[in-house]
Amino acid sequence: MAISYNHSMSACQKIKTDQAMVRDRLKQSQSLIGLSHDEMVQALRSIGVPEHQTRMRVRQLWHWFYVRGVSSFDEMFNISKPMREMLKDNFSIAYPEIVEEQISKDGTYKWLLRFPARGAGKPVEIETVYIPGEGRGTLCVSSQVGCTLTCSFCYTGTQKLVRNLTAEEILLQLLFARNRLGDFPGKDKPDHSSLSEERRKITNIVMMGMGEPLYNFEAVKKALLIASDGDGLSLSKRRITLSTSGVVPEIIRAGEEIGVMLAVSLHAVCDSLRDVLVPINKKYPLSMLMEACRNYPGLSNAKRITFEYVMLKDVNDSLDDAKKLIKLLKGIPAKINLIPFNPWPGSHYECSDWEQIERFADVINRAGYASPIRMPRGRDILAACGNLKSTSERLRKSERLQLESMMGDDLSSI
């Protein structure tokens, strides 16, 4: 059974009042999370930190933020108390508020997080998902609140774009999750967690949450460069995957300026169908997309592009489609992830039969491409691929019952 914790409903009134006061103060103070080294130097200079100290202070702060995972200046014991007070008076470390935490029966976590407004209107809510696996743990990170792409099979696409997330908000999803899972030195893991104590919990990041990362290029770039910085979070760029639906002009730039692994939401082998499934194809058709993929910087057998392909019954799952997919990807070092369609209320598609998915995969495998079938994770908490949607647009009870009915047979076989 999935476990759900609604944090905002269980807090006492005094805590709510205190949190509101803190949030009001945070709206007025600059966050240091998400700043580059040089930007942090400038921020410290602006409050009067002596010039000869700024680089040292930045190194200290970087270590506390990204190696130790602290969320309070008071925890930074190697910084003098007067300096800590100066930092507290001028800056913030504003971790998001947990609105709801859900834990799937398969161990997947989904968090609904609320970020303060910070001058951007009302507070916004986004969803972040953690997927534990054998020898690894993957965090699925959002880049936007909502999405503009309206892919017809994707639940997230039914939520209109509210705004882009900042580099701070993208990074804070990772910092929050590592703290929550006890993944920083000296941090306790949750009482209800079954996660191993012996290894790093979050080994991989995938930019596959809410939104199109390449429509928020600068913030995503900044966040991922900080996440991969060797003096901080130190995630290998080989373990960070940026997923795009095909924003062709930014693909080459992403390879040159960010240098992480690339995934492409493909889902169709001809323009006429992809125009329906992934409407951005009308602007950047398959010929343009494939050309950009062939020219992706660093592309090699060791740095393959992952192509995501959702399996839709009687839509894109024929063996002829599989053969056309092989032809389409010819010459591109690639892996093809086959994704069983995850149902959601109001969707008009069905998942391909399992036997058909296996036959499809076999055709691709025989052509020399790896084509793993992605086992659905977190379906019972709407954390599976294509299911994310912030709870500012929560499911009505009738919709949730409909979803449970739709998924009943599938869940029993996983």
UniProtKB/Swiss-Prot annotation:
GO molecular function terms noted in the UniProt entry: 4 iron, 4 sulfur cluster binding; metal ion binding; rRNA (adenine(2503)-C2-)-methyltransferase activity; rRNA binding; tRNA (adenine(37)-C2)-methyltransferase activity; tRNA binding
Residues of the Radical SAM core domain: 133-380
Cellular location(s): Cytoplasm
Binding site for [4Fe-4S] cluster: 147, 151, 154
Main localization, broad class: cytoplasm
Cysteine disulfide partners in this protein: 140-385
InterPro entries reported in the protein's UniProt record: Aldolase_TIM, Methyltransferase_A, RlmN_N, RNA_MTrfase_RlmN, rRNA_lsu_MTrfase_RlmN/Cfr, rSAM
Cross-referenced SUPFAM superfamilies: Radical SAM enzymes
Catalytic activity, EC: 2.1.1.192
Keywords assigned: 4Fe-4S, Cytoplasm, Disulfide bond, Iron, Iron-sulfur, Metal-binding, Methyltransferase, rRNA processing, S-adenosyl-L-methionine, Transferase, tRNA processing
GO cellular component, one term: cytoplasm
Residues annotated as the enzyme's active site: 127, 385
Catalytic activity: adenosine(2503) in 23S rRNA + 2 reduced [2Fe-2S]-[ferredoxin] + 2 S-adenosyl-L-methionine = 2-methyladenosine(2503) in 23S rRNA + 5'-deoxyadenosine + L-methionine + 2 oxidized [2Fe-2S]-[ferredoxin] + S-adenosyl-L-homocysteine; adenosine(37) in tRNA + 2 reduced [2Fe-2S]-[ferredoxin] + 2 S-adenosyl-L-methionine = 2-methyladenosine(37) in tRNA + 5'-deoxyadenosine + L-methionine + 2 oxidized [2Fe-2S]-[ferredoxin] + S-adenosyl-L-homocysteine
UniProt-listed GO biological process terms: rRNA base methylation; tRNA methylation
Cofactor binding: number and manner: Binds 1 [4Fe-4S] cluster. The cluster is coordinated with 3 cysteines and an exchangeable S-adenosyl-L-methionine.
Cofactor needs: [4Fe-4S] cluster
Matches recorded under Pfam families: Radical_SAM, RlmN_N
Residues that bind S-adenosyl-L-methionine: 211-212, 243, 265-267, 342
Domain of life: Bacteria
Keyword Cytoplasm set for record: yes
Function recorded in the entry: Specifically methylates position 2 of adenine 2503 in 23S rRNA and position 2 of adenine 37 in tRNAs. m2A2503 modification seems to play a crucial role in the proofreading step occurring at the peptidyl transferase center and thus would serve to optimize ribosomal fidelity.
Similarity comment: Belongs to the radical SAM superfamily. RlmN family.
Note: Reaction proceeds by a ping-pong mechanism involving intermediate methylation of a conserved cysteine residue.
Name this polypeptide is given: Dual-specificity RNA methyltransferase RlmN
